[in-house]
Every structure is written in C-alpha cells, then in structure tokens.
Amino acid sequence: MLPAPHTCCRLLQQLLACCLLLPRFLLTVLLLWLLDFPCVRRRVIRGAKEEDPGAPEREDPPLCVSDTNRMCTLESLKAVWYGQKLDFFKSAHLGGGAPNTEVVTLEGQRLCRILDFSKGHRPLVLNFGSCTUPPFMARLQAYQRLAAQRLDFADFLLVYIEEAHPCDGWLSTDAAYQIPTHQCLQDRLRAAQLMLQGAPGCRVVADTMTNASNAAYGAYFERLYVILDGKVVYQGGRGPEGYKIGELRNWLDQYQTRATGNGALVIQV
C-alpha cells in the first residue's frame, strides 16, 4: 500500500531539510569539538574576566563558557540539530505575517495568543528565552532597561520557551538556574516565574507544551522579533551569537525617528 500524498510530501520536506542543514550542522560539530580544547576556547570565546572592570555595563556582553562545560556531547549535538531544524521550518519570516500562536499568562494561567498583546499601531517586541540560557540571562537586565525606556511607543513581551540547557540534557554550569526539562505546563510556569523575578515589571508569558511559539518563530535557544500591524518587521538572529539587545535598540531608535515616514520600517539582519 502506497503512503498518502501528504505523508510523502512531509518525508520529502524532511529529506530536503537534512540535505540543506547537514553542512552547517557538521561545521557546528567541528566548532564544538574544537571548543572542548581549553586553549582554543580561551582564544575564540572572550571571557567576562577579560573586560575592563571599570567599563560601563554592556548590553551584549561577550560569550563566556567555563572550562567545566563540555561543548561536544550527544546532548549538545541533539540540541543544535533541533534548533537548526526549528529555524528551517519556522513560519515567521521578515516582512511576512506574524504567527499568532497560543501562550499562557502567568497570572491566572489564561490561554491567549501572541497578537493579543499588540496594541494599535505600536511595535510589539517579542523576546524568547529561558532561565538556563546564560547569554539570555546575561542580557535580561539590558532588555528590562530598554523596555522601560521605550514603553512610550512600543510594547514588550517575554515568551518563556523550553529550556536551552536543562540539567537533564545539555547541562551548562554557567546557567543561573539548574532546571530539568519541562514535563508539564506547571513546570514551565514555575520556571517563567523565576525569569519574572529577574526582570520585575516586564510582561512574561509561557509557550504551551506543544512548543507552538518556539516552532513558529524558530526561537530556540533565544531570539528577538518585532511585530507591527501583524507583520514581522524585525527578525533577530538565532541565539546565542545572533541574539543582540543593542541591535534591537538601534532598530527601535530608527523606527522612532522614522515613524512619521512612509509606512512601516522593515530591517533585514
């Protein structure tokens, strides 16, 4: 018996994704393997200890990975492959419609949709991440400051997704918290409450246990978006290296300057 047409189409999509992603994945594997050599790691990754203690706090501090962390493991490769596949199959694209996926509020645990938080013609900033992602947590206060400074013309929403480095998966000793993989919605909501403690005053919601928002926006490990009038007008790079609060600040500054210009501002990154 021949498989159904939609099954064949899905298999072909998966095969195409594997062919396109495999070269990039293998390069990532090589990089992770090299980073397990301390001499290479110290040369490639600038640790926070190299920064001038008297310098002002940076919005996007350099990546810092302790020598105790293994980079090339089965769990790390599974996480990298998963993130690359999510990015390939995401439905959110610059200039296209914003996926209106379901999320859960922390207060009242009410099911709603992402675009419910969009108000009129104001930009809606989406910040996807989790407490076990060190680069995300290192930039959380910078995001909080930016949100406080731009609330007069933009809205901000933190979306808590699945853990980047769960303690029962790709463990990171640099993570602010040791949290296992979420087994139920309550696990995710408890973790999201920890994030809220680190960013008081920010609006936080949690992705559903189907990970619909994470998949639609290709958000794993962390990612930034701006939605305006139902369209994606800013799409940040995939974290950790593409996750840049400073770049988001520049976009918002340009938008504020040109808000009275011709139409919405769309910036490719």
UniProtKB/Swiss-Prot annotation:
GO biological process, one term: thyroid hormone catabolic process
Extracellular side of membrane: 36-269
Location of this chain's protein in the cell: Cell membrane; Endosome membrane
Transmembrane segments: 15-35
Pfam families: T4_deiodinase (PF00837)
Domain of life: Eukaryota
Cytoplasmic side: 1-14
InterPro entries hit by this protein: Iodothyronine_deiodinase (IPR000643), Iodothyronine_deiodinase_AS (IPR008261), Iodothyronine_deiodinase_I/III (IPR027252)
One term of GO molecular function: thyroxine 5'-deiodinase activity
Key words, A-Z: Cell membrane, Endosome, Membrane, Oxidoreductase, Selenocysteine, Signal-anchor, Thyroid hormones biosynthesis, Transmembrane, Transmembrane helix
Transmembrane helix in keyword set: yes
A GO cellular-component term linked to this record: endosome membrane
Catalyzed reaction equations: 3,3',5'-triiodo-L-thyronine + iodide + A + H(+) = L-thyroxine + AH2; 3,3'-diiodo-L-thyronine + iodide + A + H(+) = 3,3',5-triiodo-L-thyronine + AH2; 3-iodo-L-thyronine + iodide + A + H(+) = 3,5-diiodo-L-thyronine + AH2; L-thyronine + iodide + A + H(+) = 3-iodo-L-thyronine + AH2
The EC number(s) this enzyme carries: 1.21.99.3
Residue numbers annotated as active site: 133
Topological relation to the membrane, as annotated: Single-pass type II membrane protein
Record-linked PANTHER family: IODOTHYRONINE DEIODINASE, THYROXINE 5-DEIODINASE
Subunit structure and binding partners: Monomer. Homodimer. May undergo minor heretodimerization with DIO1 and DIO2.
Known function: Plays a crucial role in the metabolism of thyroid hormones (TH) and has specific roles in TH activation and inactivation by deiodination. Catalyzes the deiodination of L-thyroxine (T4) to 3,3',5'-triiodothyronine (rT3), 3,5-diiodothyronine (3,5-T2) to 3-monoiodothyronine (3-T1), rT3 to 3',5'-diiodothyronine (3',5'-T2) and 3,3'-diiodothyronine (3,3'-T2) to 3'-monoiodothyronine (3'-T1) via inner-ring deiodination (IRD). Catalyzes the deiodination of 3,5,3'-triiodothyronine (T3) to 3,3'-diiodothyronine (3,3'-T2) via IRD.
Family membership: Belongs to the iodothyronine deiodinase family.
Protein name: Thyroxine 5-deiodinase
Source organism: Aquarana catesbeiana (American bullfrog)
Lineage: Eukaryota, Metazoa, Chordata, Craniata, Vertebrata
